[in-house]
């Protein structure tokens, strides 16, 4: 059956996440009434979320202490500020929102009773033979940030991509469950519809968003992880390909930036060309 987020985080009771399932969160289809806008200085993201994340500058925000503001850390923002969209039931429409990643990180940390950075270190990073330490940003309350907080070298990101390509196995060792890594490319009509209902993505190459991955083709099992500045882990299982690139697009708009499709199409063409050699 479906698992509600409130079963993982009791603190989410009464919040916008009270009505959603974990799958809704992983598919960014949680029906939130919160628009993610990185550049509008009057947006809720700019005024409340970014300062709580410690990833945005607002005069005086870094000096605030607990009790001086209702929204001190990210968890406060998730439980006290984000509201449900009454016109968008959970599961209906894809709408990328960083709050989903943060509530997912919160759930994983609660379920495993460990900090997110320790979980990543013990369950993933040490098992993929990473060449370098990664680091994760913390919010204003010194809690690890799941959205946009993780930093690694390109080579280590490629190692992670290779493990995902091989359905959770790296150099013969099981790192992540195969079921999840197979499920994300099991695209159904409802998943396609959720993407198509968002006018921002209806003309893009993505066919769906599932389990925190952007899906390009469920037959060839081609998909990506994408950051807001255009940084990408590109995976194509049919061509046995993993590509990683960093980026600094002019606008923080992830896949909606005009220069993004050019880079993605080049990667797709290169993967197909190399597979034919």
Q: PLM features: what roles do these ranges have?
A:
Residues 222-277:
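Structured C-terminal helix/loop/strand segments within mature extracytoplasmic catalytic/sensor domains
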Residues 32-33, 101, 142-144, 164, ...:
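Solvent-exposed loop/turn segments at secondary-structure junctions
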């Amino acid at each position: 059956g479906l698992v509600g987020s409130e079963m993982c985080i009791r603190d989410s009771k009464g919040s916008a996440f009270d009505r959603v399932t974990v799958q809704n969160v992983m598919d960014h289809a949680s029906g939130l009434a919160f628009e993610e806008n990185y550049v509008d200085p009057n947006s809720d993201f700019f005024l409340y979320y970014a300062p709580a994340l410690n990833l945005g500058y607002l005069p005086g925000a870094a000096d605030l202490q607990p009790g001086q503001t209702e929204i001190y850390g990210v968890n406060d923002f998730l439980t006290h500020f984000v509201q449900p969209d009454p016109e968008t039931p959970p599961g209906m429409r894809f709408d990328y929102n960083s709050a989903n990643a943060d509530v997912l990180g919160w759930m994983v940390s609660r379920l495993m009773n460990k900090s997110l950075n320790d979980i990543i270190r013990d369950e993933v990073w040490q098992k993929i033979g990473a060449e370098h330490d990664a680091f994760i940003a913390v919010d204003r309350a010194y809690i690890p940030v799941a959205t946009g907080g993780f930093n690694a070298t390109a080579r280590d990101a490629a190692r992670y991509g290779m493990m995902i390509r091989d359905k959770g196995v790296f150099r013969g060792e099981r790192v992540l469950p195969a079921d999840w890594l197979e499920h994300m490319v099991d695209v159904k009509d409802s998943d396609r519809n959720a993407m198509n209902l968002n006018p921002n993505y209806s003309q893009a190459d993505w066919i769906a968003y599932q389990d925190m991955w952007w899906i390009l083709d469920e037959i060839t099992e081609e998909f990506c992880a994408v950051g807001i500045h255009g940084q990408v882990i590109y995976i194509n299982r049919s061509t046995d390909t993993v590509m990683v690139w960093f980026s600094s697009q002019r606008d923080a708009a992830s896949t909606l930036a005009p220069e993004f499709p050019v880079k993605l199409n080049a990667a797709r063409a290169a993967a197909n060309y190399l597979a034919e050699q």
